[in-house]
UniProtKB/Swiss-Prot annotation:
GO terms for cellular component: small ribosomal subunit. Residues 15-78 form the S5 DRBM domain. GO terms for molecular function: rRNA binding; structural constituent of ribosome. It comes from the Bacteria. It comes from Thermotoga neapolitana (strain ATCC 49049 / DSM 4359 / NBRC 107923 / NS-E). Keywords: Ribonucleoprotein, Ribosomal protein, RNA-binding, rRNA-binding. This is Small ribosomal subunit protein uS5. PROSITE patterns: RIBOSOMAL_S5, S5_DSRBD.
Length: 178
């Protein structure tokens, strides 16, 4: 049991953490208002792994701890090629949409605060983004994560189509694959 806990700690040490939002919420009861906090956190290793978590508690530090733990449980793998994403994608979450486009080396990260935090921690250095619709920080972060989940690694696409990676980039079609 202890070895599993040690392995988890080693696995998580490499992650960098960012707090996206701290929101005070209140529940009205007949005894008065019960205040609590909701925290949205992002973790990533700047090398293709990123996760999003939400924590709720009566105190801010406890909510932050819960959010970071939740983010570490929800880590996804992002295909990063030459510092950018392999293809254009639109991530969606409720009324928020995020357009993610690959960019040439030297472009940098063209993104707003929430989307920037997610793509930086994913290890993407060159990307063009545009937030469409609602700009709620939680929904934007989730839309970005959903978009990154939809990305396809060119090597996997080439293997599925039984062609080379170069042919994937050139858009070559084989006879019979109309």
């Amino acid at each position: 049991m202890e070895t599993q806990e040690v392995m988890r700690e080693i696995q998580y040490e490499e992650f960098e953490e960012k707090i996206i939002e701290i929101r005070r919420t209140s529940k009205v009861t007949k005894g008065g208002k019960n205040l609590s906090f909701r925290v949205v956190a992002i973790v990533g290793n700047k090398n293709g792994k990123v996760g999003l978590g939400i924590g709720k508690a009566r105190e801010v530090p406890e909510a932050i701890r819960k959010a970071i733990a939740d983010a570490k449980k929800n880590v996804i793998e992002v295909p990063v090629i030459n510092g950018t994403i392999p293809h254009e994608v639109i991530g969606r979450q409720d009324a928020s949409r995020v357009l993610l486009k690959p960019a040439a080396p030297g472009t940098g990260i063209i993104a707003g605060g929430t989307v920037r935090a997610v793509v930086e921690l994913a290890g993407i250095q060159n990307i063009l983004t545009k937030a469409l619709g609602s700009t709620n920080p939680l929904n934007l972060a989730m839309a970005t994560i959903n978009g990154l989940k939809e990305l396809l690694d060119p090597r996997k696409v080439a293997k599925l189509r039984d062609i080379t990676v170069e042919e994937v980039y050139r858009g070559v079609r084989r006879e019979g694959n109309a």
